[in-house]
Amino acid sequence: VEDRLSKVFAALADPLRRDMVARLAADDATVNELAEPYDVSVQAVSKHIKVLEDAGLVRRSRQAQRRPVHLEAEVFDLMTAWIERYRRQVEERYRRLDDLLAGEARSDTDTDTEGAAS
């Protein structure tokens, strides 16, 4: 799983590939269609698609003469699970810190109240 995640995150490190993934989330597209808005060759886009494909983020199919690129949703479930695990750990750390700070604030208030009463 970690090796697969490494490939996914490495593939998404490139802004052009992230943009392609965002576009594919809206609809399937051919390599030529994906290349249209960019100032790069179709061959360069093909190489980017290959990286995304190797990471399991996309797959190509054949529909008559078209070879549309599809986004693979299951990889996003894998990434979400990984992120969620660490998000929960961080939230727990912040909760403990909040509890500690609240306890110190109560302690300071108690000390101030005792000092004022003297």
Name these PLM-found stretches.
Residues 1-4, 23-37, 42, 54, ...:
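C-terminal regulatory/oligomerization modules of transcriptional regulators
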Residues 7:
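Interfacial catalytic loop of ABC nucleotide-binding domains
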Residues 11-16:
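Short helix-coil-helix linker/hinge
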Residues 18-20:
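Pre-recognition alpha-helix immediately N-terminal to the DNA-recognition helix
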Residues 49-50:
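Short, hydrophobic-biased segments on the C-terminal half of alpha helices
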Residues 62-68:
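Short, Lys/Arg-rich nucleic-acid/phosphate-binding segment
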